[in-house]
UniProtKB/Swiss-Prot annotation:
One of its GO terms (molecular function) is 4-phosphoerythronate dehydrogenase activity. It comes from Pseudoalteromonas translucida (strain TAC 125). NAD(+) binds at residues 147, 207-209, 233, 258. The active site is at 209, 238, 255 (proton donor). Belongs to the D-isomer specific 2-hydroxyacid dehydrogenase family. PdxB subfamily. GO terms for cellular component: cytosol. Keywords: Cytoplasm, NAD, Oxidoreductase, Pyridoxine biosynthesis. Catalyzes the oxidation of erythronate-4-phosphate to 3-hydroxy-2-oxo-4-phosphonooxybutanoate. This is Erythronate-4-phosphate dehydrogenase. It catalyses: 4-phospho-D-erythronate + NAD(+) = (R)-3-hydroxy-2-oxo-4-phosphooxybutanoate + NADH + H(+). InterPro entries: D-isomer_2_OHA_DH_cat_dom, D-isomer_DH_CS1, D-isomer_DH_NAD-bd, Erythronate-4-P_DHase, Erythronate-4-P_DHase_dimer, NAD(P)-bd_dom_sf, PdxB_dimer_sf. One of its GO terms (biological process) is pyridoxine biosynthetic process. The lineage of its organism: Bacteria, Pseudomonadati, Pseudomonadota, Gammaproteobacteria, Alteromonadales. Its EC number is 1.1.1.290.
Length: 373
């Protein structure tokens, strides 16, 4: 069995080597000819799986994407061709939520504005948005939720309409899929009219899809003097992003919000488990076998622990400003995709075990840290 996997997917050999021969490919350079005699295709979001790509896929029986979103996959085409498909729902939800939390604490420190005095609006309450909401609510922060699809399905009673949420929030973070048309279209949901109407001092965070915000309109609004704090991990037209926008962004990164070691490896594991299920193979391998011990594993709290100390713990594991520095310094020389490919190892909050008798331990556990018994 021949297995073709994106070069940036971790642990594919460890999970799939007993099943077949694993070959790697560049996610943006994959061609139809490379799929000749391939049985399994494992991708990420940079690869468009469409009729053109599958033109010579004579043996393909399974396509898996190690991502939550599936807007890069023609799922109807796969169904028509009787090719099994799986995404990896929830694989990087924790990672993206932690990216946002790191950004929130960094902004709070730099702007001298405590988080408990601010209202945070979350647009999109799927696996990532709901994960983030749970963590923020554990810290007793004020959170507003907007998800018209879930609301229509009766799954979100506390839904706040987008324009109302934008008006009432101090920070707005987007976690929606890219929907290009229809009633719930998210393509350019933040268009020039909405961007111009934003209240001064608002923080916008986008770690979903770059096309959710009209980047050219955002640049024009910022050039006209808009008072907005921007945290952008995703961009229109990646990897050829709008360079002029960078100087207006507080924290900028290269679509890596979900790129913890655990998050990426979890995506591979989910696809391995799904493939084994479809093929009737026993799934014997688990993530714990492969993850290395992190550099820092324990911390002890004192009684005087406060919000500033939570920020220090968060940034001990991951500080978004590190990635902002990498992008600004290296984009011109190395390019967007090279920075993604060579992204430094990043771990999740759960790798740090916290002990002590602080009253904050329960909140830290909800935030994702491991708390010693």
């Amino acid at each position: 069995m021949k297995i073709l996997a994106d070069q940036n997917m971790p642990l594919v050999e460890q999970y799939f080597a007993d099943i077949g021969e694993v070959e790697r490919f560049d996610g943006r350079q994959l061609t139809a000819d490379q799929l000749i005699d391939v049985d399994v295709l494992l991708t990420r979001s940079v690869t468009q799986v469409n009729n053109e790509l599958l033109a010579h896929a004579n043996k393909l029986s399974f396509v898996g994407t190690a991502t939550i979103g599936v807007d890069h996959i023609d799922t109807q085409l796969l169904n028509d061709k009787n090719i099994a498909f799986s995404s990896a729902p929830g694989c990087n939800a924790i990672a993206v939520a932690e990216y946002v939390i790191s950004s929130l604490y960094a902004l709070s420190q730099e702007n001298a504005r405590p988080l408990n005095n601010q209202t945070i609006g979350i647009v999109g309450v799927g696996s990532i948005g709901s994960c983030l909401a749970q963590k923020l609510q554990a810290l007793n922060l004020t959170v507003l939720l907007c998800d018209p699809i879930k609301h229509a399905q009766g799954l979100l009673n506390e839904h706040v309409a987008l324009d109302q949420l934008l008006a009432q929030s101090d920070i707005v973070t987007f976690h929606v899929p890219l929907i290009k048309s229809g009633e719930h279209k998210t393509l350019h949901m933040m268009d020039k009219a909405r961007l111009k109407a934003l209240k001064p001092g608002l923080t916008l965070i986008n770690a979903s899809r770059g096309d959710v915000i009209d980047n050219q309109a955002l640049l024009e609004v910022m050039q006209a003097g808009a008072d907005l704090d921007l945290v952008l991990d995703v961009w229109e037209n990646e990897p050829t992003i709008l360079i002029e926008l960078l100087e207006h962004v507080r924290y900028a990164s290269v679509h890596i919000a979900g790129h913890t070691l655990e998050g990426k490896a979890r995506g591979t594991q989910i696809l391995y488990q799904k493939f084994c299920e479809l093929k009737g193979i026993e799934a014997t391998k688990s993530l714990d076998e492969f993850l290395p011990v992190p550099a820092i594993t324990q911390a002890t709290l004192g009684q005087s622990f406060n919000e500033a100390d939570i920020a220090r713990l968060v940034h001990l594991i991951y500080d978004v400003r590190r990635d902002d520095g990498i992008l600004l310094r290296d984009l011109a020389n190395n390019g967007f995709d090279s920075l993604r490919k060579n992204y430094p190892v990043r771990r999740e909050f759960s790798t740090l075990t916290i002990q002590g008798d602080s009253s904050q331990l329960a909140a830290l556990a909800q935030l994702g840290f491991t708390v010693a018994n």
